C-alpha cells in the first residue's frame, strides 16, 4: 500500500533520467552506475547491458530488517527470504516475481549484501514479456565503488531513499547511453554531492 504523503510531495509527477553516469531528476542529479556492457537498445538476457528507452517506475521493494517502510505513492512491499525473480527465458513466469524455491532459475531478492535494501521495479519487458529480452531491471543501491551492474541502474542508498517519496504512478525513467557507453557503465563522478534535499538521515533509524 502506498504511504500517506503531504500535499507538497504529491504536487507533481517526478520523472528520472539516466545518462552519462548520472541519474537526473527535477531537483538535481547524483552519480549512478549502469550495466557492465553499457546501455543498449537491443538488450538480451545475461548480456550485462542496461536497456535504453523510457519505462514506468512500477513499485518499491525493501528490506524491512534494514530500512523503515518507505513513504511513496507507488505500491510498497517488504521483501522476504523467499522472494525470487525468474530469469529463465523459457519459463512461463519469466521476468516475474515468484516464491522460492522455484523449479526454474530465479534471482534471490533477499541478498547478503546491501544492494536490494530498497529498490524500484522498472517496468522493462513487462507488457508483453518477451522471452530472452532481459529480466529484473531495477533502480537499486550501488556498491561503495559504483561497480557496473548486471543491467540495473544503481545509486547511493541515501539518494535512492530520498527519491522514493516523490515517485508516483505515472513516474518514468529514461535511460540513454551517451558517455557511459565508453566506460561499460562505470561511473566517472562518484562524489554523490548532488544528493537531493528530501532525504533525512535520521529517518533510517
What kind of region is each of these model predictions?
Residues 1-149, 160-205:
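Cell wall/extracellular polymer interaction/catalysis modules
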Residues 152:
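Short cysteine clusters
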Amino acid at each position: 500500500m502506498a504511504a500517506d504523503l503531504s500535499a507538497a510531495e504529491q504536487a507533481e509527477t517526478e520523472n528520472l533520467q539516466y545518462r552519462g553516469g548520472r541519474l537526473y531528476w527535477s531537483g538535481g542529479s547524483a552519480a549512478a552506475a549502469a550495466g557492465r556492457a553499457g546501455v543498449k537498445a537491443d538488450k538480451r538476457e545475461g548480456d550485462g547491458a542496461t536497456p535504453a528507452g523510457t519505462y514506468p517506475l512500477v513499485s518499491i521493494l525493501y528490506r524491512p530488517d534494514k530500512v523503515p517502510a518507505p513513504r511513496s505513492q507507488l505500491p510498497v512491499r517488504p521483501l522476504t527470504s523467499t522472494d525470487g525473480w525468474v530469469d529463465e527465458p523459457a519459463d512461463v513466469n519469466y521476468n516475474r516475481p515468484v516464491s522460492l524455491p522455484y523449479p526454474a532459475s530465479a534471482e534471490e531478492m533477499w541478498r547478503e549484501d546491501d544492494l536490494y535494501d530498497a529498490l524500484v521495479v522498472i517496468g522493462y519487458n513487462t507488457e508483453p514479456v518477451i522471452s530472452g529480452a532481459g529480466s529484473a531491471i531495477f533502480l537499486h543501491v550501488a556498491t561503495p565503488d559504483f561497480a557496473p551492474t548486471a543491467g540495473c541502474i544503481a545509486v547511493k542508498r541515501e539518494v535512492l531513499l530520498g527519491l522514493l517519496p516523490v515517485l508516483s504512478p505515472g513516474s518514468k525513467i529514461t535511460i540513454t547511453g551517451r558517455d557511459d557507453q565508453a566506460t561499460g557503465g562505470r561511473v566517472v563522478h562518484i562524489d554523490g554531492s548532488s544528493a537531493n534535499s528530501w532525504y533525512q538521515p535520521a529517518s533510517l533509524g
